[in-house]
Amino acid sequence: MPKRTDIKKVLLIGSGPIQIGQAAEFDFSGSQACRSLKEEGIEVVLVNSNPATIMTDPDMADQIYIEPLRANIIAKIIEKERPDGILSGMGGQTGLNLTAELAEMGALKGVEILGTPLEAIYKGEDREKFRDLMNEIGEPVPKSIVLNTLSQIDDAIAKIGLPAVVRPAYTLGGAGGGIGRTREELTRIVELGLSRSRIHQVLIEESVMGWKELEFEVMRDSTDTCIIVCSMENVDPMGIHTGESVVVAPILTLRDDEFQMMRSAAIHIIRALDVQGGCNIQFAFKDGDYRVIEVNPRVSRSSALASKATGYPIARVAAKIAIGLRLDEIKNSVTGCTAASFEPTIDYIVVKVPRWPFDKFKGADRTLTTSMKSTGEVMAIGRTLEESFMKAKRSIDTDVRTHTSPSEIRMILSRPTDERFHCLFDAFRQGFTLDEIAGLTSIVPFFLEKIKNIVDLEKRLAAGCTDEDIFLAKRYGFANTEIAALTGRGADTIEALVGAPAYKMVDTCAAEFPASTPYFYSTREGTSEIVRDKKQKILILGSGPIRIGQGIEFDYCTVHAVKALREEGVEVHIVNNNPETVSTDFDTSDRLFFEPMLLEDVTNILMTDEYYGVMVQFGGQNAVNLAVPLEKELKRRGMCTRILGTSPDAMDIAEDRDRFSVLLTTLQIPSPANSSAYSEAEAREKAERIGYPVLVRPSYVLGGRAMEIVHNTAELETYMKEAVRVSQHHPVLIDSYLRNAIELDVDAVCDGKEVLIGGIMEHIEQAGIHSGDSACVIPTQSLSPEVIATVREYTKKIALGLGVVGLVNIQMAVKDNVVYILEANPRASRTVPFVSKATGLPIAKIAAKVMIGKKLCDLGFHEAKIRHVAVKEVLLPFNKLAGVDTILGPEMKSTGEVMGIDYDFGLAFYKACISADNELPLKGNVFVSVNIGQKDEVIPIARRLRDLGLTLYGTEGTVDYLHEAGVEAHLVRKVQEGSPNVLDMMHHGEIRLIINTPQDRQSRQDHYQIMRAAVDFQIPYITTLQAARAAALAIDAIKREKITLEPLSHYLR
């Protein structure tokens, strides 16, 4: 049937901030859906709270609302915009939950739910309804019982037994779920699961741990035509969330009759659900038998992987199906000549490996279960499974420990952590047999054989190998440097022997039809499919897997750079290995390389064609770290390709503390007393000279990794043992810590002669909390015109002094009206998307044009003057990571960001808090606990909260000095003083907000239980007095006036 004529305007709900379980894949799918709908002449209204997304760009939708994703707010937008339909399946779990809530509150009268019908949401997400549907259609499910209260636990154990799996309804990434092996463990998981579930429901399910886990991505249209887009198989068995698993596509270990049985079951289920669009179905499989585990009646993380693995644009097709088009009416935009009803065929093997945040969270529980903990993932493509495994291993940018202790290896293999995939290789190196490893892990022997092949070849290479072994190593995906290290030969010698790789095309049809959107991977089989031409080309280095410190913001910058260069007629190629992102969409760039982001791989790509230049400054710290070695490698090979924009030497000046200090001295710009040290003794001497407390950090890292404020020599010595390991080739940087200073971030573009300031952001938290974790505001709220003028002057001096061409981010601190420079980063920063959305200045696009020679004076942009207030707030991952210190400090911990925008600071901050799942209460009890050094500062905040009608509670010391100041507060016992205490009040829902500001390590330990409980019971919490002051302003504002609901374009006009 042709597209529906009654659907003229569609509301699309985004997924909100990046978080564990819901990352960039929904920006990728949402952006694709927006473009797909607009191609059909549909007016698109988009709601999302995340400014760091491509989908919230002005050209992606007709009306864009950057607002909290709350049903009551979206209901008002629906009332205002009056859409004909709502597309919920592109916004992940958030989108489905909101659609269900909107329907239940009656806000969707006259608005049709497109693609995924409401009943399919209920049957897919409500565990009891899903189980009943599967039983009704004769599809086997694990034995299970639905719980709504803790009192049903014993009944569940009697019927299901232990261990048992807990699956909460309507949650994301398995949040609140897990595997209970004892009654106590099961009770704890169920209590958490019930609190996290939208409908207060969990399913207790018999364990099928150790079975194979299989996934099918299915597409269905309104005429009941179904296709399997991709089949996927988890290397890790059941018991580990698929988002935490190493995944292989296509399925390799089923016989054809078994595969056809599973294919038929997947199609049977999507038909029963009546989903029109995409659907992800997960199965457990063992010895010819299977169980249906769950269904995602929406685009998911697995959908993004399936889309990138096959080249099939799932979200684009699903959006068109939602407005009535049939699969055979939709053109496959990759081939340009086949219909979307053709099932994709692939002649290569794809491997996905997750990226975990444990390099940031040393104390976190690293055990992998049915609840997600990873922040991102990499994807690798090869012609053999060995090759894909090795390319994926090289793509994960984590320091991997080698395990040699047999007992330690057994423990990791049997109780899996994030180290298990790498530990499989260690086990074979230490002489474990295949049967032993299979017994410990329940991993299919087929996968273990491939890993054993790799390790056996490593041993041959190290023992004195033949040239044939080296050729085999290349077919297995070894890098030249890895072969050189094993054989003792030089990397150049290896390269001369093996030559260059071939580049093959991903085309959805195993080369049966020509592809019109080139998308390549390297391999050692056959001839290259790249056709060289004379066009001017630029390669942009992407940002790799999403991790804390390097998130979706850098992909945003990459995509903007591509758009800018294409506007100037330049052919743009991207190299990246992240399957979740817009930059790796099939039509973002002129040519896409899905490859590891390492020097050898990037150099190989540059040798495939005549490249004019490479851009490194949009891909975050990893790409910037490649600048100097890549420049050297290009010169060594005599290649004409240049590093475009700011020179690698200027980047080095900014990173090298001594060189940067010389520059600041020359420019007569103050900075905190600072130095650098290469040893513990030198660090001790320099810190004592500067004076404690000092801020210490390694150089050349992103996200404040291993950064800490240390107060004495003992803390410094403890720190140095970690920091020196993190930064083996660069010094540790030591800065005087400015207490109670206001921190600023400035994003600017420089063309070498002029500087355009994109935005000056004032941090709401004090200096010393990582800028990536601090809420910030545009325009500044507390700085004098004289200070702002100094900030502008210093920004211009530093940008020109460094010789910046492109973007620069400068961090400053203001104390006693003196502006100090903390650091400068001549590259894209994580605040670029926020600045662009808040001001309307597309600074990443401007920077890309400047990098190819355009002048700011010719581009016609000026610093924005805005009437509104925009607040960036962060989302913290503590609800997904047990054992993590919840106190903010100089090391970054947040996974994503949101934006609040209004005409008043208090209202904008209130919106930002709602969006960050930290909704401030307008009534109820507030628990306040601050250290004695902050008692004078907390009194006016406490007084304002009391005057606003909130009731204050605190422990003895805090209550005493509040009473002395005439502020009424109620005493509550400390945890160690027995019950009833603050934890009891939290458990019973009697506390609505926590203000808790520990300063030293001892008070951190004392307050850890309170903050952990706040996370578990979803009570908003504040850990700095600056944020508490802003919260009081926000509560005051929201009590006085209503929030504004306007499209972004109205604020920026």
UniProtKB/Swiss-Prot annotation:
Pfam family, one: MGS
GO cellular component: cytoplasm
Keyword Amino-acid biosynthesis appears in the UniProt entry: yes
Binding site for Mn(2+) 4: E823, N825
Note describing how the cofactor binds: Binds 4 Mg(2+) or Mn(2+) ions per subunit.
UniProt keyword annotations, A-Z: Amino-acid biosynthesis, Arginine biosynthesis, ATP-binding, Ligase, Magnesium, Manganese, Metal-binding, Nucleotide-binding, Pyrimidine biosynthesis, Repeat
Pathway assignment: Amino-acid biosynthesis; L-arginine biosynthesis; carbamoyl phosphate from bicarbonate: step 1/1; Pyrimidine metabolism; UMP biosynthesis via de novo pathway; (S)-dihydroorotate from bicarbonate: step 1/3
NCBIfam families (alphabetical): CPSaseII_lrg, PRK05294.1, PRK12815.1
Entry domain remark: The large subunit is composed of 2 ATP-grasp domains that are involved in binding the 2 ATP molecules needed for carbamoyl phosphate synthesis. The N-terminal ATP-grasp domain (referred to as the carboxyphosphate synthetic component) catalyzes the ATP-dependent phosphorylation of hydrogencarbonate to carboxyphosphate and the subsequent nucleophilic attack by ammonia to form a carbamate intermediate.
Name of the protein described by the UniProt record: Carbamoyl phosphate synthase large chain
Chain's gene name: carB
